[in-house]
């Protein structure tokens, strides 16, 4: 077997491409490698036509743990359901690819990117996106590419192209920019309250690098003798569109200009026009051309009616500057927000509404043991902030079976999660694991940004000391020729019939998350810059409304939330706290009825529903890890008597022995003649031997002259859930 090997020198690195060797039955395939990261990307098209008004494109990213030299956990020791990370990368591939396929195309297309080897210095996701474009071009599938993606990081004042995982964690920016020859088609970003100007410069920096990769793909096709397929749309029968334009335009325009009507009223009126039109056509003679057309394709009327509605709505925005609800192009819908709407069994809650979009967000405070362990190729091993987004069918007035979260729900949840992470307190300040759930109760556009706002309010209601409040809005765009209109706070119909969905989240200081998807083949950096700048006043307006509901964290936590104490010990003394076989730490948890977690770095977190019990456990651990010095004097309790001496607990959990010869200046025959178990005595540290054992003495010590602590008593507390 022989393939063709090509290489691209990019940003001082070599990207290696192998074509014609792997997956010979796919339309196109490429092994794309950089460093030790290797991905096989395939593109396959079937000749089967889907009777639908959308492109049946499937993009899958697969990662196998053998790529990192690991064996999966669980009984089966085999990969199961794709982890969240794989789902997000699948979406990252789909989003820039979808707008570049011809709008008329209805063939089933599947792109599969399989990560076969992972180098932590070279993240696989942007390679997978670029590889998807190459595989599609090699498969000679109609495609308005090439398309490529790069990641941009920011450390200090310097932009870094395609940073490693470690550099991403250290930096203030993680942005993926994907583009075509026509411009940028997708953006995905997380940032540490970065200014709008710095964000725009990062996008510009990224797109410059994208153009280099696009040129490399053009050169690759030329070297392989492959001609890019850009077939034109098939000739369509204009009979029905002409009929609809003549008979429905006036009615649709009247509906779109009724600015005071609700979404349901508008939808009903448009549906009535369509139904009446269908009835007129069905009343025609059987051999009528229109009637024959509809009998052959029952979806044709809905499809062409939607196209006409789209055309008229866009024309109204371009020519009149008016949207279907009467708002100006830069106007935000009516906002209402409230916090603490549920009983405090729920640790934090909030309701956020913008127009007809309504989101209920709840916050749960958990202990470190509630952190989510990550069993994927991500170097991070656990998550301590979780955001889950749910989109039930009733939120759009529909009925369908309730399923597990789909790709869209996972993606929206991850975006809102990313927007909040930069403002979360550090572990040592607030050691709780946080889970926020956003329930979309009503949807009419921008539910993910509604979830960002709801999450912020809910976290504050739970008493989480956020560094700043975060709000978000979705920006839209209508492009007709050279005419461009940017829309602020788009609603459902503007998202559905528009050209862009650009979600911008951030604080008063700057941006924390971006997500841009296109329905056209690209936009210039200047247009994207304009959208980002116009999002800022909208975000600040929303922040003001949120602050009216709650502007700082609640002073006290819910009485039903666990109480946590967090402090640091010497990492070398972790074994002392745990004890042989875990006996010491188990004894502390049983004695105080608490949960104790110790991280490798020495951070100890104690959880209890009773603050006094947590403080008692902390005192014991600090006693175990406190260094004792010769000559120190303590007052403690005799815990055990043995023939040669007595053991005294000088600190919580730490004992020393008084040899029988050190009990008194005079000769002692029996230990019990001087002390008994339970007696309180004052002792001096005589020596600490080479094995760390503490030897004590009563000789020459005035009783009740040392440091003492009250004997701890078990405190009954409610069990942790």
UniProtKB/Swiss-Prot annotation:
Pfam families: KH_1, PNPase, RNase_PH, RNase_PH_C, S1. InterPro entries: ExoRNase_PH_dom1, ExoRNase_PH_dom2, ExoRNase_PH_dom2_sf, KH_dom, KH_dom_type_1, KH_dom_type_1_sf, NA-bd_OB-fold, PNPase. Residues 711-721 have a biased composition (Pro residues). Mg(2+) binds at residues 495, 501. Gene3D superfamilies: GHMP Kinase, N-terminal domain, K Homology domain, type 1, Nucleic acid-binding proteins. GO terms for molecular function: 3'-5'-RNA exonuclease activity; magnesium ion binding; polyribonucleotide nucleotidyltransferase activity; RNA binding. Keywords: Cytoplasm, Magnesium, Metal-binding, Nucleotidyltransferase, RNA-binding, Transferase. It is found in: Cytoplasm. GO terms for biological process: mRNA catabolic process; RNA processing. Coiled coil: none annotated. It comes from the Bacteria. PANTHER family: POLYRIBONUCLEOTIDE NUCLEOTIDYLTRANSFERASE (PTHR11252), POLYRIBONUCLEOTIDE NUCLEOTIDYLTRANSFERASE 1, MITOCHONDRIAL (PTHR11252:SF0). This is Polyribonucleotide nucleotidyltransferase. It comes from Prochlorococcus marinus (strain MIT 9312).
């Amino acid at each position: 077997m022989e393939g063709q090997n090509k290489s691209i020198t990019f940003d001082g690195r070599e990207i290696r491409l192998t074509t014609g060797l792997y997956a010979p039955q796919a339309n196109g395939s490429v092994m794309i490698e950089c460093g030790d990261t290797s991905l096989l990307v395939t593109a396959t098209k079937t000749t089967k036509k889907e009777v639908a008004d959308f492109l049946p494109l499937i993009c899958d990213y697969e990662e196998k743990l053998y790529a990192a030299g690991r064996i999966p956990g669980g009984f089966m020791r085999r990969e199961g359901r794709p982890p969240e990370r794989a789902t997000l990368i699948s979406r990252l591939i789909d989003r820039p690819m979808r707008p570049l396929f011809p709008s008329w195309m209805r063939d089933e297309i599947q792109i599969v990117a399989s990560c076969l080897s992972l180098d932590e210095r070279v993240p696989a996701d942007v390679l997978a996106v670029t590889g998807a474009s190459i595989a599609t071009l090699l498969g000679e599938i109609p495609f308005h590419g090439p398309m490529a993606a790069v990641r941009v990081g920011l450390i200090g004042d310097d932009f870094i192209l395609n940073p490693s995982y470690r550099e991403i964690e250290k930096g203030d920016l993680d942005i993926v920019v994907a583009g075509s020859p026509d411009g940028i088609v997708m953006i995905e970003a997380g940032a540490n309250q970065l200014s709008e100007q710095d964000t725009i410069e990062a996008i510009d920096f990224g797109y410059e690098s994208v153009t280099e990769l696009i040129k490399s793909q053009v050169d690759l096709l030329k070297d392989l003798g492959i001609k890019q397929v850009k077939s034109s749309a098939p000739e369509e029968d204009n009979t029905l569109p002409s009929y609809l334009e003549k008979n429905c335009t006036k009615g649709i325009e009247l509906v779109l200009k009724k600015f005071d009507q609700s979404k349901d009223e508008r939808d009903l009126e448009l549906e009535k026009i369509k139904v009446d039109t269908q009835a007129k056509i069905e009343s025609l003679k059987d051999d009528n051309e229109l009637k024959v057309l509809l009998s052959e394709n029952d979806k044709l009327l809905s499809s062409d009616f939607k196209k006409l509605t789209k055309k008229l709505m866009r024309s109204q925005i371009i020519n009149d500057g008016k949207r279907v609800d009467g708002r100006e192009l830069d106007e935000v819908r009516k906002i209402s927000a409230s916090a603490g709407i549920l009983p405090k069994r729920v640790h934090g809650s909030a309701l956020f509404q913008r127009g007809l979009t309504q989101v209920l967000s709840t916050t749960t405070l958990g202990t470190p043991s509630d952190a989510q362990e990550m069993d994927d190729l991500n170097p991070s091993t656990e998550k301590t902030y979780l955001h889950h987004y749910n989109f039930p069918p009733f939120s759009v007035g529909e009925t369908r079976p309730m399923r597990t979260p789909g790709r869209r729900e996972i993606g929206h949840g991850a975006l809102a999660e990313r927007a909040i992470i930069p403002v979360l307190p550090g572990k040592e300040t607030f050691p709780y694991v946080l889970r926020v759930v956003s329930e979309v109760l009503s949807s009419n556009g921008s539910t993910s940004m509604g979830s960002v706002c709801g999450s912020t309010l809910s976290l504050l209601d739970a008493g989480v000391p956020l560094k700043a409040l975060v709000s978000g809005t979705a920006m839209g765009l209508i492009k007709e020729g050279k005419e461009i209109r940017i829309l602020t706070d788009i609603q459902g119909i503007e998202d559905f019939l528009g050209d862009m969905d650009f979600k911008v989240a951030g604080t008063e200081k700057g941006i924390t998350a971006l997500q841009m998807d296109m329905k056209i083949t690209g936009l210039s950096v200047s247009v994207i810059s304009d959208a980002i700048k116009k999002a800022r006043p909208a975000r600040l307006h929303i922040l003001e409304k949120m602050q009216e509901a709650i502007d700082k964290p609640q002073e006290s936590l819910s009485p039903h939330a666990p109480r946590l104490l967090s402090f640091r010990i010497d990492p070398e003394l972790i074994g002392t706290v745990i004890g042989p076989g875990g006996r010491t730490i188990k004894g502390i948890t049983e004695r105080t009825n608490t949960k104790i977690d110790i991280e490798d770095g020495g951070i100890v977190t104690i959880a209890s529903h009773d603050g006094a019990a947590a403080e008692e456990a902390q005192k014991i651990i600090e006693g175990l890890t406190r260094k004792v010095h010769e000559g120190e004097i303590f007052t403690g309790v005799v815990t055990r008597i043995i023939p040669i001496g007595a053991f005294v607990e000088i600190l919580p959990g730490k004992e020393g022995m008084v040899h029988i010869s050190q009990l008194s200046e005079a000769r002692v025959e029996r230990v019990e003649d001087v002390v008994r178990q339970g007696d309180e005595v004052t002792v001096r540290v005589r020596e600490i031997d080479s094995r760390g054992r503490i030897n004590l003495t009563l000789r020459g010590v005035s009783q009740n002259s040392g440091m003492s602590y009250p004997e701890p008593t078990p405190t009954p507390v409610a069990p942790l859930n």
